[in-house]
Amino acid sequence: MEREPENGEPAEIKIIKEAYEKAFMFVNKGLNTDELGQKEEAKNYYKQGIGHLLRGISIAAAEPGHTGPAWEAARQMQQKMKETLQNVRTRLEILEKGLATSLRNDLQDVPKLYPEFPPKDACKKSPEQESVSTAPQRAEVDGSASAACAGPSGAPSALPVPSPSCPAEAPPAYSPQAAEGHYTVSYGTDSGEFSSVGEDFYRNRSQPPPLETLGLDADELILIPNGVQIFFVNPAGEVSAPSYPGYLRIVRFLDNSLDTVLNRPPGFLQVCDWLYPLVPDRSPVLKCTVGAYMFPDTMLQAAGCFVGVVLSSELPEDDRELFEDLLRQMSDLRLQANWNREEDEFQIPGRSSHPSEPPKEASGTDVRQSSSSGSSIDQGSKDARHKGKRGKKTKDSSEEVNLSQIVPCEPSSEEKSKELPEWSEKVAHNILSGASWVSWGLVKGAEFTGKAIQKGASKLRERIQPEEKPVEVSPAVTRGLYIAKQATGGAAKVSQLLVDGVCTVANCVGKELAPHVKKHGSKLVPESLKRDKDGKSALDGAMVVAASSVQGFSTVWQGLECAAKCIVNNVSAETVQTVRYKYGHNAGEATHNAVDSAINVGLTAYNIDNIGIKAMVKKTAKQTGHTLLEDYQIVERPQRESQGGATSTEGRRDIGKQVEEEKPGAGKKDK
């Protein structure tokens, strides 16, 4: 915000500016100390900021005599101070009532994800010594002196001791029962299994902090209360064991104007005690072919650290779809390309594959490679499909778990790469080259027509004898024509805005309908049309020809549009100039307004015709067809070029680009 010279500013504006600067200085200090958990100091800063906010708001800036850019800027500052005052008061009330602490302190109070196991020496002790020695340790794990461990009843209920030969089981890993399982950390004995932690450990599941602690403008877009696990990858490529299933939520801040002031992102992802800021088109996210979502670990200062998020198969399908849709909107989500290499499938830490098993034909990717290597992100792929096979159970009941089996990333597909018939490519290239030539010819023809109109008008003016006395045009008529020009111009702009809105809605609806039409429409096509005797897809060849036809029609339509504008501009300009030459300046100006009004009326009528329900349905169907044909458009340069100086398809497309550059800049109105 630019500041005017203070010598000419009223005292009230100076007071408002001073209060504005001091208020936000104290509010920012309060936010910083609040994030560090220093409540009392944060409350003092908030109170000082509220005092300056009230002082700045108390100045009356809406008086009738207070006009000008300086007062307008002061009113904007007061409006911002009012909004900030409401948020600061709400946060101060929360701090004074002790309802919540800062988000970071809440996350530090989450119970430990990994309990402390009893020492291995306990296996060598007698049952009597076991019951006495393990009680304090279990009480320490539980975090409180539970009756089962410390009370008198805890000693008689001594549990069997595991044999020293029994190996310790690996940390908890992701399994098909992740939504309900992983709430026991146990080790086997001769008579069964028993938990190494108390019941309180299972009851005290981590819960997300209250949404009120984030401010009044925080909006929770999705909350999955349980069934989400995370694992960590360090710069050396080592992968940690997955965490216990916990909650996941995505929060968005509604007031974007405060993002810069409060130094916060537009939204964030929270999985238990891990946070990740979400900035549209900037926050990188990789969806692996094995179903895990990989994020850079921004909570650690070290570079090369990553976090994987795994959703349980027991979660509703709607939750998974909503989660991925939100990631597409609020981050830069990429899909991992298929890796056609024979290597071990993705292994959850703690599960080992057995060398006796035959190698699997899989295209899975180790998460350490996919997360630490930037080359694994496919920049252009939107259809990454997984072709992995399921893990097998061995005789000792240890199971190799493949995440792609549990959380499908994309529906598996066994389709081979589609080969197009030669005739389809030839026809498509001929259509595109022909359309480019037609468009170029239309524009060039319009240019020659415009020059002919100019020459003809010049010769006509040479034969016309100007009037000795310019024609007097009534001021009322001149004023009426000018008003008509302005009114029709406004109507044309408004109708164009309405048409743009209808087109935007139709485009969105068409893009949403296209995948469903493609999915269900392919089921209606007979197999005989999908493949010919040579194994080539005749249907895909027809789709390529159709896509090229659409491209060619668009090119010709642009040429027609450009040619029409060129001719209309020349006719209008020469008509006005001829009338001005014959009847004087006033008559020429009236003619100019009348011609512009007629053009505006025509554009308005054309736009209104494209606003109705029928036009909406047409545009939706057209956009659906265009979206279906996007995958079949020819974008590569053809390898065969005719000899003898013949122009290739790519060269003709360059001519089409020149057509766009040669459009006259003095166009009246754009349809």
Swiss-Prot record:
Pfam families: Senescence
InterPro entries in the record: MIT_dom, MIT_dom_sf, Senescence/spartin_C, Spartin-like
Region entry Ubiquitin-binding region (UBR) domain, spans: 190-385
One GO cellular component term noted in the UniProt record for this chain: lipid droplet
Domain Senescence: 431-615
Tissue: Brain (at protein level).
Protein's recorded name: Spartin
Native organism: Mus musculus (Mouse)
High-level lineage: Eukaryota, Metazoa, Chordata, Craniata, Vertebrata
